[in-house]
A protein has these predicted regions:
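PAS-family sensory domains and close relatives that share small-molecule sensor folds
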Residues: 83-85
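Conserved hydrophobic positions within beta-strands
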Residues: 41, 79-81
Length: 118
């Protein structure tokens, strides 16, 4: 039997408004790196994240992320750009859906999110 989570009775991947540092590497449909950088998340869930960056990326681009959950825990995930909004010229709010993540990374994200639960 698995441990009960605050999120068990909510949507599959609840979003938590939390700023954490990430390193990103956007790749086009040919797997060519088109932009790398550092940003902070606007929210985070076990299924994805969103953040603001200056990279003009497109929906369906692949992104490799290193997410710094806290001072000790960092996880690497691969995701797909689900949507892009342009709040101001030169700024891109990017929604990422996680695609590939080791179980250990998923467990760290769940533990981190549970630590933020009321």
């Amino acid at each position: 039997m698995s441990e009960y989570s605050y999120y068990d009775n909510m949507r599959d991947t609840p979003r938590i408004s939390k700023s954490v540092f990430i390193k990103y590497d956007f790749r086009d449909t040919n797997n060519k790196s088109v932009s790398t950088g550092i940003a902070t998340t606007r929210d985070l869930s076990v299924g994805g994240t969103k953040f603001l960056c200056s990279a003009a990326v497109r929906k369906d681009y692949i992104v490799k992320l290193q997410i710094q959950l806290d001072k000790i825990n960092q996880v690497g995930v691969i995701g797909t750009v689900a949507w892009v909004e342009i709040p101001k010229p030169g700024q891109f709010l990017v929604g990422i859906q996680f695609q590939s993540m080791p179980e250990t990374s998923k467990a760290k994200i769940v533990k981190f999110l549970n630590s933020l639960a009321p």
